[in-house]
UniProtKB/Swiss-Prot annotation:
Annotated 5-amino-1-(5-phospho-beta-D-ribosyl)imidazole-4-carboxamide binding sites: 29, 96, 260
Entry's EC annotation: 6.3.4.23
Protein name: 5-formaminoimidazole-4-carboxamide-1-(beta)-D-ribofuranosyl 5'-monophosphate synthetase
Binding site for ATP: 148-210, 232
Gene3D superfamilies for this protein: 3.40.50.20, ATP-grasp fold, A domain (3.30.1490.20), ATP-grasp fold, B domain (3.30.470.20)
InterPro entries xref list: ATP-grasp, ATP_grasp_subdomain_1, IMP_biosynth_PurP, IMP_biosynth_PurP_C, IMP_biosynth_PurP_N, PreATP-grasp_dom_sf
Substrates-to-products reaction catalysed: 5-amino-1-(5-phospho-beta-D-ribosyl)imidazole-4-carboxamide + formate + ATP = 5-formamido-1-(5-phospho-D-ribosyl)imidazole-4-carboxamide + ADP + phosphate
Similarity field: Belongs to the phosphohexose mutase family.
Keyword Transferase belongs to the record: no
Amino acid sequence: MGKVKKEDIMDIVEKYDKSNITIATLGSHTALHILRGAKQEGFRTAVVCEKGKEVPYERFGVADEFIFVDEYKDIVNSDVQDKLRAMNAIVVPHGSFVAYAGLSNVEDKFNVPMFGNRDILRWEAERDKERKMITQSGIRMPRKFDKPEDINKEVMVKFPGARGGQGYFICSSYEEFQNKIQEMKERNWITDSDVKDAHIEEYVCGTNFCIHYFYSALKDEVEVLGMDSRYETNIDGIVRIPAQDQIEANLSPSYVVSGNHPVVIRESLLPQVFENGDRLVETAKKLVKPGMNGPFCLQCLVNDDREIVIFEMSARIDGGTNSFMNGSAYSYIQFGEVMSMGRRISREIKNAIETDKLDVILT
């Protein structure tokens, strides 16, 4: 639990002009459709941008206001916070916001109203907390290896924080683990601190889906808004090379996310999809109140037994939602109109303003 208290945030909200709310975010990650969705719902928008990185938000015309900073981490500076509060801002957090601002700063220093549950962000950042929440929900996860010396089969090695897969690798022995750790350190992709916190789990063979949910605290309902799969470099390039050439090229696979494409899942798997979302939401309410408020994502593999195995979660808007900026097959069925995740967030904020329930959705 951070130093920023909900009651202090609600004191700030109490002074806001509710008829002139601004939806704000950091200029990265999913900012385009967060801001576009806000404009679709009738809000003013603001983006906090590094100088020189404002081009997409200018060219696509999604931001009414620009707050320029030297570095993205400066969003927690007092002058930036003052500007945000002065424009009645509600900030929508995303992966880059947490990574650049720093989780402790978001918890302890960022005194601006945020959509969702700021306390839950640590539960996605720390692997043990993430695993606790998912397993206590009764959701299948890959087996965890407590130390690299225990590796006796194919495993995936991951590192903490929102890093888009950078530094992740597959290995099948302790010796191979050591060799690949050294290689990743030489590429400056990981540090000694990362190695200490390495998360080692069984490699599950299957098809990849990232399932994007929205939990409406106003309706107490879990929605499935869309799904995507990832383009990862350089693994997606390597698999295009014939096997013999792969061996001769001696390339080391990496799993850095470079893009996303929309997918739909086999319809008979949707009961599992909804059940996993419902279970996680109920567990989150118990572990970190008020729970999984707003968008969240479960990254999974579907094995040949048609079992959904969850290997990672995002407790805020996930980058894969960029794959359905104009709505997905699922959001269209749900709403009958174009509904991106960004617009869904602003729809919830608008409904909360109209029903005087901003305290239910902000922290």
